[in-house]
Amino acid sequence: MASAGGDECEGAAPEADRPHQRPFLIGVSGGTASGKSTVCEKIMGLLGQNEVEQRQRKVVILSQDRFYKVLTAEQKAKALKGQYNFDHPDAFDNDLMHRTLKNIVEGKTVEVPTYDFVTHSSQEIRDMFHLRLFVDTDSDVRLSRRVLRDVRRGRDLEQILTQYTTFVKPAFEEFCLPTKKYADVIIPRGVDNMVAINLIVQHIQDILNGDICKWHRGGSNGRSYKRTFSEPGDHPGMLTSGKRSHLESSSRPH
């Protein structure tokens, strides 16, 4: 996600007198079908951005899915059989992703590619995010969501499960789960955790209002703490199967 941020910490200046606002990047990660997109959409809704015309929005969602490499004819044939590994980092055009994020941070206009899931037409990136979130959802719940979603896409159940055990689960454990230590915020239960969602929304609202002093005081790149958000009834300080985030190696639904 990206929102319009600012650079001043000396008190609120009239909007017309403020310097040009720089985008504030938030990386959202998690396992396949953990609810990453749902969390982002919920945040957008609470910020009132879904009712705003696309070009007038102050907060936008940029999906890593858009940066899949274009498949060759041979790779497309494998993909149709569920034999292509969409979860490996090499499946993404990381150079294009890095250039796009860099241009966004610099306030430049960018063109984002669109990936078609029917035709299948690094640290460097991780460090570009000012805030990193990880959406934590139980693995059984994620698998059931993925199965239901892919069946709706016309996929065969046996193919779905084979792809999950062959590619998705191993890639999550090798590439996504190890990024746990880099997350600033963990969101247990995803979109159901409104304590976390509301607090993140408030932070974004502060940034949109130009009140970002707290981010600058907290340390480099706007990160001042690592935290797992719990709701009433949760054991204080307890991480329930916590996982952490960054866009570069997240295990996205395919």
UniProtKB/Swiss-Prot annotation:
CDD domains: UMPK. Substrate binds at residues 87, 115, 120, 146, 155, 163. It catalyses: uridine + ATP = UMP + ADP + H(+); cytidine + ATP = CMP + ADP + H(+). The modification Phosphoserine is found at residue 230. Residues 1-29, 224-254 are annotated as: Disordered. GO terms for biological process: CTP salvage; UMP salvage. The modification Phosphothreonine is found at residue 228. ATP binds at residues 30-38, 192. It holds the Pfam family PRK. Belongs to the uridine kinase family. This is Uridine-cytidine kinase 1.
